[in-house]
Regions:
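Membrane-proximal, non-transmembrane interface segments of integral membrane proteins
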Residues: 5-99
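Juxtamembrane helix-loop transition segments at the membrane interface in multi-pass membrane proteins
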Residues: 2-16, 116, 193, 197
Length: 226
């Protein structure tokens, strides 16, 4: 069981990269059919299987790789929305937890646990039912991906551009720590969405507006507790 779950995660990552390459190279023909079949195989246990099947019906040897990716994106519309809602809820709670804590450094272990739980919740939305060893492996993979992400790609950079910096200055130390932890947790949520999806990221799965909404919630609630 554990081996099968690990293989599923690896297969999703591999197909995601292959689809991105096929789209970049403008592939069409039999290679697109093979990619569609590989996607259908990995989505066989997805709670959204029927939605994906309906969207993939028109993909054949005459289709371009981009059409396949767009069809998969349509299938991911609902789980993406659910995952973003989960991320928003959990990240706000985590940020407020740190902002209200008198011992934020000691609470970082609990934050790690909350983030790991969030990752598992996101995986479940996409139909990935993982045992503890595989969940831990997925969490480590996400942290590694974040370590290698370019600075221009991070949610922190896209959310700030002076705005988040001003927010941190205006808040107290504890609330500022809550915001920093929230931004980090937001990046973890985004990476969890990435590694749970077959389709490569066409547009930011977690955008600037969501980051602003989360940070605004922490600011308002922190101010209300003073």
């Amino acid at each position: 069981r554990v081996w099968r779950q690990r293989h599923q995660i690896d297969a999703i990552t591999s197909l995601n990269r292959r689809l991105a390459e096929a789209e970049r190279e403008g592939e069409m023909g039999q290679s697109v059919v093979e990619l569609r079949e590989a996607a259908e195989h990995l989505l066989v246990d997805s709670p959204y299987r029927q939605v994906f099947e309906e969207n993939l019906l028109g993909i054949d040897a005459g289709s371009h790789a981009t059409e396949l990716v767009v069809a998969l994106e349509r299938g991911y519309a609902e789980p993406d929305e659910r995952a973003r809602a989960l991320i928003q809820r959990e990240v706000v709670r985590t940020g407020l937890f740190i902002a209200a804590s008198p011992y934020p450094a000691l609470d970082l272990l609990l934050v790690a646990w909350r983030n790991a739980r969030m990752v598992n919740g996101i995986a479940q939305i996409y139909g990935l039912k993982l045992s503890f060893p595989v969940r831990w492996r997925l969490y480590r993979m996400i942290l590694q991906n974040m370590a290698f992400a370019s600075a221009t790609e991070t949610v922190l950079d896209s959310a700030s551009e002076g705005w988040a910096s001003n927010l941190l200055v205006n808040l107290g130390a504890r609330a500022g720590q809550g915001v920093a932890v929230a931004l980090y947790s937001l990046r973890i949520g985004r990476q969890a969405m990435r590694v749970s999806r077959i389709a490569p990221e066409q547009r930011p799965l977690v955008d600037r507006n969501l980051a602003r909404l989360i940070l605004g919630s922490i600011r308002e609630r922190s101010a209300g507790t003073k």
